[in-house]
Every structure is written in C-alpha cells, then in structure tokens.
Amino acid sequence: MSHNPVRPWRNVYRRKSRQIMVGNVPVGGDAPISVQTMTNTLTTDVAATVAQVQAAAEAGADIVRVSVPDEASARALREIVRESPVPIVADIHFHYRRGIEAAEAGAACLRINPGNIGSPDRVREVIRAARDHGCSIRIGVNAGSLEKHLLEKYGEPCPEAMVESGLEHIRILQDNDFHEYKISVKASDVFLSAAAYQGIAEATDAPIHLGITEAGGLVSGTIKSAIGLGNLLWMGIGDTIRVSLSADPVEEVKVGYEILKSLGLRHRGVNIISCPSCARQGFDVIKTVEALEKRLEHIKTPMSLSIIGCVVNGPGEALMTDVGFTGGGAGSGMVYLAGKASHKMSNERMIDHIVEEVEKKAAALDAASAAEAAE
C-alpha cells in the first residue's frame, strides 16, 4: 500500500498476493512492485544482449527478460545470466525443451505461453526442470495466442477465455505441487486487458505480472500503458510490471517508473514537476526541463523538483518539493529549498545551480537514510 495518513485519498490498497522469488527479487506480497523490461537484441549476440541488460539495470530494471527461440539462444543464455546484474527471465514459446535448457542455463524464471507450450505432459517436464534448478514460472497468457479450444468455446479472445486459460495452467502447476509461479493475461486492447486482469485477480492469489502487450511506439505505447497499467495499479492489482514499447528497453524502464511514481507506489530518482509554459514564463521552461532531465539522470535518490515558469503556480508548487525554481523578472527567478523561498538566481546560471542544489539534497537524504539504517 502507498500510505498517506494526511491525505487518505492518495492511498492505494494493494491486492493481497502470495510472494515468490525471481532470483533474488521478491514478487508479490508486501514486496515493492518490480519493474521489468525485455531485450530486443539477438540472444545469440551475447555482447549486445549483455550490454542491453546492463543498460536496463542501470536505468532501474529489477528483472530483464530474454527470448530463447532456439538451441543456440539457450546456449548463449548461460553466459548472459553469468554477466547479468539482475535476474534473467527466459521467454519460451512453442518448444518446451527450450524451457528445460533455459532452466539448466541458470534462468531465474521461465515464461511459458499456455497457447503454444504444448500438452500438460510437456508442461510437467518444464515444471520438473524449474524445480530442479530453482526457477520460478510465469504463466503468460496472451490474447493473440489463446488455445484453440478456448477460441472455439468463446468465439474470440475475451476476458473469460484469458482467465480460463490462466487457471487451467495454474491447476497443472498446482497438481504438480509447484507454487513458485506468477501470471499475466495480456492483450493489446486496454479494455480487454483490464477486464482479464480484474478477473484473474479475483480468481487467484498468485502474484500478477502487469502489461499491455504490443502497446506501440514510445508516445502511443506510453499512453496506452499508462492508462491500462495505471488504472489496474490504482485498483491495487499488480506485483510486477513491464511496459511494452517499440523502443529502447531503457525507455520501457523509465516509463514504468513514471507510472509507479505517479501513484506513489515506488520512487526512484528526481520527480520533475514542470509547467507546460506560456507567455508568462520568465525563462525557457521546455529547454530547461529537457536539460535537467539529462543532467539529473545519475540521481537515484527519490526526491522532487519543481520548475515553474512564473509566479501564478510556482510558489505553491515549490511548497511541496525538495528543490524548486520559479521564474520572475529581469532575467532571474527564485530558488526554493524544502518548500521555502531561499535565494534568487539568474536564468543564465540557473541550470547548473539547480543541479548543484539537487545533488546536495540527494547527498543529505542518502546520509540520513544511512544513519537511520545504522541505528
């Protein structure tokens, strides 16, 4: 739960779920909602894949998924796992043996698709490998690849069909006394995804992996994911998320964190609050924010920064942020620290000065956290 006793209307009450482990990352229960992404390199290109995994981890990814379409990819996975700073999920479709090979290669989790993994006997083989090698499993239902008997029964991909697919495979895992699993019921349609996720959340206590599949490019996919995932998270549904974009995986991680930050569910780095700018702005807000986003990427400490072009809303927004800058006149503006007006600063020096103030505040917050942990 994101707890705010002063403003209870900001609280999000998370659905109670079992906790499993994906490598060293807890998923479900009271664990923080983890952020995932997926590589888009050829898995057999180990150097490129490892570089992408490391970049995603640096951006904050807790878990990274890698596709394992063939034997060569399964062989490459062993080295990728060895070089990865975060747990690796092996994405398995069609060939159940790839799941067995991925478990042997050290994958922390196996994603299997009920629509194409094959018979229950094949699933049992994957379960055995997962148990032997300490892997968890994600049952990854997708509207675009539902089982034939469910499409015949329901006529089209629908929430009921997706939930039934997921529950059928949960039963297979449970019948084999395997409980380290999570589930997803993804679709590219926001309405279908939301309804399916609500259905599966009511039907099981398994940890839920949230995603809108094939969401689109950076802008359209971000909007679709923010609406779909944001609404479900606000309802308390979701234990780990992956934003699917036709873009660099690092962008998926950034968008994922922004969605969580907007709901107060997880915080990482500087949350910049800025105005869209208008004729009243005392400096170029858009260019300033673009520059600050790049200059402050290295800050991992959760904190807030307001950049407002004029005094209409600037002082009020600054009251609620760690550092703030409000445009004034005559080529300068007011710097706010801890919600209070502190000193004036010229527009010319403003960006460098704000970076200094943010770094100073981040260091102070880190020191306070370290001291508290040492008590």
Swiss-Prot record:
Cofactor note from UniProt? Binds 1 [4Fe-4S] cluster.
Task: List UniProt keywords, sorted A-Z.
Answer: 4Fe-4S, Iron, Iron-sulfur, Isoprene biosynthesis, Metal-binding, Oxidoreductase
Q: Which residues of the sequence carry a binding annotation for [4Fe-4S] cluster?
A: 275, 278, 310, 317
GO biological process, alphabetically ordered: isopentenyl diphosphate biosynthetic process, methylerythritol 4-phosphate pathway; terpenoid biosynthetic process
Reactions catalysed, as given in the entry: (2E)-4-hydroxy-3-methylbut-2-enyl diphosphate + oxidized [flavodoxin] + H2O + 2 H(+) = 2-C-methyl-D-erythritol 2,4-cyclic diphosphate + reduced [flavodoxin]
Return the EC number.
1.17.7.3
Cofactor dependence is on: [4Fe-4S] cluster
- Highest taxon of the source? Bacteria
- Entries under Gene3D superfamilies matching the protein: Dihydropteroate synthase-like, Sulfite Reductase Hemoprotein, domain 1
Instruction: State the InterPro entries in the record.
Output: Dihydropteroate_synth-like_sf, IspG_bac, IspG_bac-typ, NO2/SO3_Rdtase_4Fe4S_sf
Q: Return the broad EC class.
A: oxidoreductase
Pathway per its UniProt entry is: Isoprenoid biosynthesis; isopentenyl diphosphate biosynthesis via DXP pathway; isopentenyl diphosphate from 1-deoxy-D-xylulose 5-phosphate: step 5/6
- Any one GO molecular function term: iron ion binding
Q: Does the keyword 4Fe-4S apply?
A: yes
**Of which family is this protein a member?**
Belongs to the IspG family.
What does this chain do?
Converts 2C-methyl-D-erythritol 2,4-cyclodiphosphate (ME-2,4cPP) into 1-hydroxy-2-methyl-2-(E)-butenyl 4-diphosphate.
Q: Mind telling me which PANTHER family this protein's record contains?
A: 4-HYDROXY-3-METHYLBUT-2-EN-1-YL DIPHOSPHATE SYNTHASE, 4-HYDROXY-3-METHYLBUT-2-EN-1-YL DIPHOSPHATE SYNTHASE (FERREDOXIN), CHLOROPLASTIC
Q: What is this protein called?
A: 4-hydroxy-3-methylbut-2-en-1-yl diphosphate synthase (flavodoxin)
Q: What is the lineage of its organism?
A: Bacteria, Pseudomonadati, Pseudomonadota, Alphaproteobacteria, Rhodobacterales
User: What gene, per UniProt, encodes this protein?
Assistant: ispG
